[in-house]
Amino acid sequence: MTEVRRRGRPGQAEPTAQKGAQALERGIAILQYLERSGGSSSVSDISGSLDLPLSTTFRLLKVLQAADFVYQDSQLGWWHIGLGVFNVGSAYIHNRDVLSVAGPFMHRLMLLSGETVNVAIRNGNEAVLIGQKECKSMVRMCAPLGSRLPLHASGAGKALLYPLTEEELVGIVVNTGLRRFTPTTLVDLPILLKNLEQAREQGYTVDQEEHVVGLNCIASAIYDDAGSVVAAISISGPASRLTEDRFISQGELVRDTAKDISTALGLKPPVA
């Protein structure tokens, strides 16, 4: 394959990357200093404490301000930690809360199903694995934490999709397309929508070797106290063991576990 290089002096890209990394390190150092200082400080104190030129410190603060990580007090001119930092921290705490609540239910589901249990969240147009409880079987299906899964072709991904409206689903498909991973991947939009409609009705979705040949998954959505989908829980196992004749019984088990976790997160059951 032909490699295309940008014009420029030899060795130019590496120093540029190093400068970018240095700027990032300094920006993080500023945020850490503000945290140690109770959330606010003057630009001169930040500059002196971190041994940075005043002009560099101010330039970095303006970059952080553009990202809403800091803001400047109009009266005193001091710099304060901004809402962006709170949002990042809240996302981390929220995910940790889901896992801490889900932990005992994941263990129970692993024992009852005999399969590996996973928890995933949506990150843009992908599902990301954030928790896992491995089964005790000699043959088991496991993926590293942080693994990214296609929304349309994985159990957890489809569980994160099926509560969405058709308009939202179409928007995602337009952005990502429907890539084929295996012969059974759902790459036709009407068929995918019908599959998700069925999943919505039964409360769980099935990935029948749609992402990886030989791997079956069953998943269900987890809701928070506001009724928003925050994660998906799934079981995954070899297709030779997690067979089609077990989909209903295992699916109901996964669905009921997702309901229990949602209730523990504060979701109120619908009024009869």
Curated annotation (Swiss-Prot):
GO terms, biological process: negative regulation of DNA-templated transcription
SMART domains found in the cross-reference section: HTH_ICLR
UniProt binding sites for glyoxylate: S154, G155, A156, D207, C217, S234, I235, S236
Keywords: DNA-binding, Repressor, Transcription, Transcription regulation
Segments forming domain HTH iclR-type: 21-83
IclR-ED domain span: 98-267
Protein task: Negative regulator of allantoin and glyoxylate utilization operons. Binds to the gcl promoter and to the allS-allA intergenic region.
Name of the featured protein: HTH-type transcriptional repressor AllR
UniProt organism field: Salmonella typhimurium (strain LT2 / SGSC1412 / ATCC 700720)
